[in-house]
């Protein structure tokens, strides 16, 4: 009955207290893990088994029927007037097995607290619904002189690897007018009258501490691939992995059957991507995205994959010939090969049928070449005919012009010369000189008379 009265008093003090309620947000790592945590360039030879390492212990998931988050809150006191190191005052787990140090305390009910000092039992209280409403405030029924010091409210989340702490300074005074709370720039300072109840506030209503969600529905890992030259926002999804065991495969067909992630990835926190065998077409940027919405974890690891040529294999050692004395005569063993059988590399010729568009393209090239040749031939023929026709007309014009411009004087001179030429050509061979002289007289023509036709024409014109 007395305990219920004190609990009722504690609730009234909680509602009417004028202390400042400080609520801390999500932890620093939880908000800063949205950025890229690592970026590296890896090279693998073509045909090898490529491994892109993506590991995180914060993604390890252990299934529990009670949905135990392994959360604990504990209050510590340091700097008290009694002196000595900091000491644990009280702690409380969300549910399940409770421990102090390495000692097992057994099973406790949800909201059950553990008080370490016998003098503090029944005097220090934590709200039983702390892990449901996020109120982890410490209530002290009657403040004593030894209670003065620096109190720290510590929240641990072993599953999400989170740790948060809040400090409150408690001062005990005999003056009721000095009682109150203020902020000194780093922490809350609470002054309480001796013998009066005190409420040290510690409030954190983040869902990770209030058990409002199930982690198996909010824990996912996925791999993305960016071909060379493709931005991050247009990456192709390769794999989706869920803590519930569901898996989804995407990506191009030539890569989908060669990528895999181990089946126990969530049990070990190892989500490395295996590509077996890796090919030159697999080059690009691969991203490993780790999302734990319950714990507030968002990480991305980037890998730039380069595929190199496979290393040249060393030539096989020469086989021992039968005549060098290194081989022994006898029947061949069961694993010996027949030397008459030679094994060569098999070559497969693949004939890819050409499309109809390719056929018409080649036909167009042939027709265009033929048309160009015909046009060139016609041009040559026309040019030749035009040249011949022009030469014939030129010769006709030249002959006509020569026939019109005949000089009569030159004609006369030419006629006289022609007669002389003819007389000189006559060759007579006679037996005596008398006959020769007679023949010359008979055949000799009268001397040519030069007539100037121009003068004759002028004479006729003057008459």
Curated annotation (Swiss-Prot):
One of its GO terms (biological process) is cell adhesion. Glycans are attached at residues 135, 324. Residues 309-341 are annotated as: Disordered. It comes from the Eukaryota. Keywords: Cell adhesion, Cell junction, Cell membrane, Cell projection, Cytoplasm, Disulfide bond, Glycoprotein, Immunoglobulin domain, Membrane, Nucleus, Phosphoprotein, Repeat, Signal, Tight junction, Transmembrane, Transmembrane helix. Pfam families: V-set (PF07686). A motif (RGD) lies at residues 268-270. The modification Phosphoserine is found at residue 244. The record marks 346-347 as: Cleavage. Residues 384-463 are cytoplasmic. It is found in: Cell membrane; Cell junction, Tight junction; Cytoplasm; Cell projection, Cilium membrane. The chain crosses the membrane at residues 363-383. Residues 1-19 form the signal peptide. The keyword Phosphoprotein applies. Residues 321-335 have a biased composition (Low complexity). GO terms for cellular component: bicellular tight junction; cell surface; ciliary membrane; cytoplasm; nucleus. Residues 20-362 are extracellular. The RGD motif is involved in integrin ITGAV:ITGB3 binding. Homodimer in cis. Does not appear to form trans-homodimers. Interacts with ITGB3; the interaction inhibits ITGAV:ITGB3 heterodimer formation. This is Matrix remodeling-associated protein 8.
């Amino acid at each position: 009955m007395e305990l219920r009265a004190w609990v009722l008093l504690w609730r009234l003090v909680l509602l009417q207290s004028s202390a400042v309620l400080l609520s801390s947000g999500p932890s620093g790592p939880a908000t800063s893990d949205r950025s890229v945590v690592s970026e590296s360039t890896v090279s693998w030879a073509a045909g090898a088994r490529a491994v892109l390492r993506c590991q995180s212990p914060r993604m390890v998931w252990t299934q529990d029927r009670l949905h135990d988050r392994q959360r604990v809150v504990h209050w510590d006191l340091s700097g008290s007037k009694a002196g000595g190191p900091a000491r644990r005052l009280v702690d409380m787990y969300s549910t399940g097995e409770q421990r102090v140090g390495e000692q097992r305390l057994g099973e406790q009910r949800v909201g059950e607290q553990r008080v370490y000092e016998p003098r503090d039992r029944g005097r220090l209280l934590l709200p039983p619904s702390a892990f449901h409403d996020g109120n982890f405030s410490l209530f002290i029924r009657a403040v004593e002189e030894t209670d003065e010091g620096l109190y720290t409210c510590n929240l641990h989340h072993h599953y999400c690897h989170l740790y948060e702490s809040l400090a409150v300074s408690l001062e005990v005074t005999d003056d009721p007018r000095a009682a109150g709370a203020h902020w000194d720039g780093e922490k809350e300072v609470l002054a309480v009258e001796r013998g009066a109840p005190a409420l040290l506030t510690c409030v954190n209503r983040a869902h990770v501490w209030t058990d409002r969600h199930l982690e198996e529905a909010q824990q996912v890992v996925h791999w993305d691939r960016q071909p060379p030259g493709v931005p991050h926002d247009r990456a192709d999804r390769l794999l989706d992995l869920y803590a519930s065991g569901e898996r989804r495969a995407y990506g191009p067909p030539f890569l989908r059957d060669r990528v895999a992630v181990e089946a126990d990835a969530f049990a070990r926190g190892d989500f490395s991507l295996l590509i077996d065998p890796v090919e030159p077409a697999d080059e690009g940027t691969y991203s490993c995205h780790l999302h734990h919405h319950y714990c507030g974890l968002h990480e991305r690891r980037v890998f730039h994959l380069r595929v190199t040529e496979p290393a040249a294999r060393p030539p096989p050692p020469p086989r021992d010939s039968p005549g060098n004395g290194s081989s022994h005569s006898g029947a061949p063993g069961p694993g010996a090969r027949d030397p008459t059988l030679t094994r060569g590399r098999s070559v497969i010729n693949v004939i890819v049928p050409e499309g109809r568009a390719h056929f018409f393209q080649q036909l167009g090239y042939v027709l265009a070449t033929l048309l160009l040749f015909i046009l060139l031939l016609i041009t040559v023929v026309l040019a030749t005919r035009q040249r011949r026709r022009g030469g014939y007309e030129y010769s006709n014009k030249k002959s006509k012009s020569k026939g019109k411009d005949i000089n009569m004087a030159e004609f006369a001179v030419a006629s006289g010369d022609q007669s002389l030429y003819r007389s000189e050509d006559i060759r007579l061979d006679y037996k005596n000189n008398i006959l020769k002289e007679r023949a010359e007289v008979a055949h000799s023509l009268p001397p040519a008379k030069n007539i100037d036709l121009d003068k004759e024409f002028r004479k006729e014109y003057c008459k």
